[in-house]
UniProtKB/Swiss-Prot annotation:
Similarity comment: family membership: Belongs to the proteasome subunit S11 family.
GO annotation (BP), single: meiosis I
Function description: Component of the 26S proteasome, a multiprotein complex involved in the ATP-dependent degradation of ubiquitinated proteins. This complex plays a key role in the maintenance of protein homeostasis by removing misfolded or damaged proteins, which could impair cellular functions, and by removing proteins whose functions are no longer required. Therefore, the proteasome participates in numerous cellular processes, including cell cycle progression, apoptosis, or DNA damage repair.
Subunit structure: Component of the 19S proteasome regulatory particle complex. The 26S proteasome consists of a 20S core particle (CP) and two 19S regulatory subunits (RP). The regulatory particle is made of a lid composed of 9 subunits including PSMD13, a base containing 6 ATPases and few additional components.
One of the record's GO cellular component terms: cytosol
Protein name: 26S proteasome non-ATPase regulatory subunit 13
Keyword match Coiled coil: no
Annotated gene: PSMD13
Single GO MF annotation: structural molecule activity
PANTHER family: 26S PROTEASOME NON-ATPASE REGULATORY SUBUNIT 13 (PTHR10539:SF0)
PROSITE patterns: PCI (PS50250)
Residues annotated as domain PCI: 171-338
């Protein structure tokens, strides 16, 4: 049995600046007000004053461990995550988290958060195989939770960092966007917003099978790059989203300075040419989606002889559906893969809808005027 009152009294005298906080902890502990005490401890461990040294480890050993069985499991893990940060030996931290996981197994969310923390430590020490297994395990558990919870953001932060480490651009792009969807952007420092926006933008451009940039373009995190020396990335993403090959080539003086993009220039050109074909299909009315080889060649900046190969590639990866008329050198499109639209593309849809409404109105008036002749 630990001398909890003695520890609290000693802490009050050793840190006069925080005496009131220690007194409050002692008061709540003595009165056995466990919920209020949990909230107070949560605030306590997040105070920057206690972030240095091993003060939180001592707090756990001499105080929290005495009543942790009365604490909400998820709150307990939240508290322990702050304690673990003061453990310099990762193996000690991992062992501590494993023991904690057993203590909170009554709560799926607490177990998920604990496993996510274990995965993050494994990633930090370079154990990629265990990190991968942890992510797969936790992902399955998350799918059984109702809605989005407080543990989702921590999981997507871990998974995106793992995919970034192994160079899987497409998976990083997907999970990094999911992370941003689970947090309030205002809670992230501007420097972190800029770094996340930059790595997300690069991953979107370089990721295999990533043809949907609308969600990133509409996310406020991208605005952190505006009017900075990385503004060119926003411009490049907009060029890709609209399939503007000419704009992409004009921006080469900027994106060509980024080593990863410069090394993958041919791949980037193929991707934006496919996006160009998608955009040409999307902007046409549904009843007029016949594209000539010349039109495609002109927009995609390729020769007429290369058009058929481009269309076949788009068909094979499921970006569009349609048929190729080699004799007349035309392509008839029947479907284009849905994407998150930017404001300009939404405006285009609005204009087409207004045109359709006008067309329907004209037909209505025609039928109204000619109804007598038709009926007789």
């Amino acid at each position: 049995m630990k001398d909890v009152p003695g520890f609290l009294q000693q802490s009050q005298s050793s840190g006069p600046g925080q005496a009131a906080v220690w007194h409050r902890l002692e008061e709540l502990y003595t009165k056995k007000l466990w919920h209020q005490l949990t909230l107070q401890v949560l605030d306590f461990v997040q105070d920057p004053c206690f972030a240095q040294g091993d003060g939180l480890i001592k707090l756990y050993e001499n105080f929290i461990s005495e009543f942790e069985h009365r604490v909400n499991p998820l709150s307990l893990v939240e508290i322990i995550l702050h304690v673990v940060r003061q453990m310099t030996d990762p193996n000690v931290a991992l062992s501590f988290l494993e023991k904690t996981r057993e203590k909170v197994k009554s709560s799926d969310e607490a177990v998920i958060l604990c496993k996510t923390a274990i995965g993050a430590l494994k990633l930090n020490i370079g154990d990629l195989q265990v990190t991968k297994e942890t992510i797969e395990d936790v992902e399955e558990m998350l799918s059984n939770l109702p809605g989005v919870t407080s543990v989702h953001s921590r999981f997507y932060d871990l998974s995106s960092k793992y995919y970034q480490t192994i160079g899987n651009h497409a998976s990083y792009y997907k999970d990094a966007l999911r992370f941003l969807g689970c947090v309030d952007i205002k809670d992230l420092p501007v420097s972190e917003q800029q770094e996340r926006a930059f790595t997300l933008g690069l991953a979107g451009l370089l990721g295999d099978g990533v043809f949907n940039f609308g969600e990133l373009l509409m996310h406020p995190v991208l605005e952190s790059l505006r009017d900075t020396d990385r503004q060119w990335l926003i411009d490049t993403l907009y060029a890709f989203n609209s399939g503007n090959v000419e704009r992409f080539q004009t921006l080469k003086t900027a994106w060509g300075q980024q080593p990863d993009l410069a090394a993958n220039e041919a791949q980037l050109l193929r991707k934006i040419q496919l996006l160009c074909l998608m955009e040409m299909t999307f902007t046409r009315p549904a009843n007029h989606r016949q594209l000539t080889f010349e039109e495609i060649a002109r927009s995609a900046k390729i020769t007429v002889n290369e058009v058929e190969l481009l269309v076949m590639k788009a068909l094979s990866v499921g970006l569009v559906k349609g048929s190729i008329d080699e004799v007349d050198k035309r392509v008839h499109m029947t479907w284009v893969q849905p994407r998150v639209l930017d404001l300009q593309q939404i405006k285009g849809m609005k204009d087409r809808l207004e045109f359709w409404c006008t067309d329907v109105k004209s037909m209505e008036m025609l039928v109204e005027h000619q109804a007598h002749d038709i009926l007789t």
